[in-house]
């Protein structure tokens, strides 16, 4: 199996802005809206830096979803299994950002933007596809070539 360039960050950025209070979660009905908004915000941010937009890929969304479900079940923000997720795509480059407890897509993106490693992942020029998922308060962004 082709080895992926592992650019997934191992640093975890928690709250740059005030997170929602414990117990408050992204409502299930709002999850699709949150994902659409976050996707648009990521692509707008990339465009401001002269980068191409990322297309939404169902297979990457499924990997992001599995990871967000796992983090929620374990109540632990992590990059556990990143190497396996990346290798399963057979892509040359994959990046991953995770987040927890951001009340809106805008505050989630802002948290990532203010973390150098997460920001680098958002602005990785080699990736072209992305998947996003939200399970309770756990967000996963997964992008590959």
Predicted regions and their residues:
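Bacterial N-terminal signal peptides
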Residues: 5-15
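A short alpha-helix/helix-coil micro-patch that ends at or immediately precedes a cysteine
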Residues: 23-72
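Surface-exposed patches in mature extracellular/periplasmic domains of secreted proteins
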Residues: 48-62, 75-85, 119-134
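Short, surface-exposed glycine/acidic/tryptophan-bearing loops
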Residues: 61-108
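Disulfide-stabilized extracellular recognition modules
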Residues: 102-145
